[in-house]
C-alpha cells in the first residue's frame, strides 16, 4: 500500500510538472497574436549601407504559402541580395534565408515572382503544392522567417519600406495574402509594418574651414583651407567666407596675387574630375571681405552611376595677408544669396538635393602680434671738415636744341552707344552689322606741348624724367537683347525640354523679330493657324529657312525638339548669318552620330567648340534638348556671353547653376563691356 502511494504521488508530481511546462510553452506562444511582420535591422543608415528587412510569421495556423507586395522608393533604396549585394531583378526571388516552406522534397514548392524594381515594387509568392501530403503530416508550420531582403541606401533622407495593396492581389490584407493547407485564404492575422528609415551622413560628417596658423604678425600669410569629411554623394558645394578687409587681404597663397571678384579658390581636390564636367565659379565682394565660391559637377548622372562618391578632401584654399596689428576672424558665414545654407555652406548631392545633417567647423580666432620695435641707431658725431673753396661756375652757352615735348595726360574717352538697329537681322547682338557691336572712340587725344624753356646761364640743369601715363583704353561695349523668357511663376525650368514652337520663338527673337515684324512670305502648315501663339515666329524662321515642315504638311509645334534637330537649326543660322561653310568630316567624334542624318552639323559644331557630347563618347542626338543646353549652345555659336555680374533672375537658377551666366545672357536686355580678358561684364540692365 505504501508503494502504491509513492507511485501515485510521483505520477501526480510528473503530471503537474508536465502541465506547468506545457502552460509555460503555450503561454509564450499564445502571447504573440497571429501576424506577419517586416522588421528592419536598422532604422538609421548611411549611403552605401545595406538594410536587411526580415519578414516573418507568428502563430499562423496551418500556414502553407503566401504572396506579398512590398513598396519602396527606388530613388532612395536599391533592392539587393542581403548576402551578396547583387541587385534584385524582375524575376529574382528577393527573400532568402527563410526558415519556413523549406520541405520541397516532401511537398513540392511553387514560386511566383513579378518585380518592378524601376517603380520600387517587389511582388513574389511561395507555397507548398502538395497540400494533401502536407495536411496528412499533421505538422503545420506556424511560426518562422519567410525570408530576408536587402536594401542598399542610395540617397540622403527619410523613406519607407512597407507592405502595400496592389490591384493584382485582390482581397489582400495590406499587400499580404496568406494561405492554409486547405488552400483557403487566411484572414485572421495582423500586419506589422516596419518603422521609418532615415538615411543620414556619418556622425563625423562635416565641412571645416582650417587655418594653418592663428598667431601671426603683420605681413604674414595665413592659408585657409575648406575641407570636407564623409560628405557622402556630394556633387556640389557653395561656401561663403567672411573676413575683415581692413585687417586681411585675400590673395592666392602660392603667387601672392590679390583676389578679385571672380578669383576661385585654389588647389581643389574634390569636384574637379573633368570626366563629370566640373563647373567652378566665384562671386566675391572684396571690398566687403567676402569670398563666395561654388563648385559642382554638371554630369550628375554619370557621377552617380560611377558609384564612387567624392566625400573627403580639400574643396579649395585661399590666402590672407595680414595688413595691420588687430585681432580678427575668418569664418564661414550665412549670406542672403544662399538661402537655407548651413553656416555659410550649401551642399547638394548627386541627385541635385540639398544635403543636411552635417557639422560646420569654424577656425579659431586670429591673434596678430604687434610688430617688434626696430631700435633706433645712435648717430655718430660728424667731425668738422675744412670747407673747400667754391669753384666759380662756368657759364653754360645757350643750347639751340629744342626740348622734347612733354605730353599731358591722355584723357579717357567715353564710348558712344550706337543706335538700336531696326533690321530684323541685328537685334540679337554679336551678329555682323547688328546692334551691340564694338563702338569706336569718338576722338583721338592730342598731346599738348609745353613752352620752350629758357636755358640757365649759371648752372646746367639735371634732366628730370617725366612719367608719361598710359592712356585708358576703353573696352568693347555694346547691347545684347534677350531672345527667350522664363515662366510667370519666376521659374526658368532649365531641365525642361523645349518644343518646336518654343524653339522657333527663340530663334526669331534672336534675329530681332517680334509679333509685329512684317515679311512678304506665305507659308502654311496644317497644324498652325494664325491664332497659334507662335505663328509669327514659325512663319519667320520658315522664311529664314531655319525650320521646315514635315512631308504631311504639318509643323508639329508641340513636339519636343531633339539635340540633333536643334544643332541643325544652329548650323543653318551660322551659314546664313556668318557665312559658315560645310567642311568634310574626316572622322566621327561621337559613337552614335556616324550615319545619322545630322552628323555633318553635329560634328562641325563640335569641332568649333560650340557643343559637347557625354563622357561615354556619345552625343545622344535623338534625346530632347533641355532649355539650359539650348541657351548655352546659342550663346557659344553667336559669340554671346556668358554674362558676368548678372543678378539672379529665376528661383530655380541660382548663381551656382552651371548655366546661370548663359541664361542671364539670354533673358536680359543689357549693356555690356568686354574686359581685358574678353569676358562679357554687365554694365546695365535695359528695361523691355
Curated annotation (Swiss-Prot):
Enumerate the CDD domains for this protein: Type_II_cohesin (cd08547)
Where are the compositionally biased (Gly residues) regions? 424-438
Give start and end of each Cohesin domain.
36-201, 207-370
Keywords, sorted A to Z: Cell wall, Repeat, S-layer, Secreted, Signal
Q: State the GO CC annotations.
A: extracellular region; S-layer
Give me the ranges of the annotated region Disordered: 372-477
Q: Which GO terms describe its molecular function?
A: carbohydrate binding
Q: Which organism is it from?
A: Acetivibrio thermocellus (strain ATCC 27405 / DSM 1237 / JCM 9322 / NBRC 103400 / NCIMB 10682 / NRRL B-4536 / VPI 7372) (Clostridium thermocellum)
Name of the featured protein: Cell surface glycoprotein 2
Q: Matching Pfam families, A to Z?
A: Cohesin (PF00963), SLH (PF00395)
Compositionally biased tracts (Low complexity) = 375-422
Please state where this protein is localized. Answer: Secreted, Cell wall, S-layer
Domain of life of the source: Bacteria
Q: Does the keyword Signal apply?
A: yes
Signal peptide, first to last residue: 1-27
One example of a Gene Ontology biological process annotation = polysaccharide catabolic process
Domain SLH: start-end pairs? 453-520, 521-584, 585-648, 649-669
State the oligomer form and interacting partners.
Answer: Assembled into mono-layered crystalline arrays.
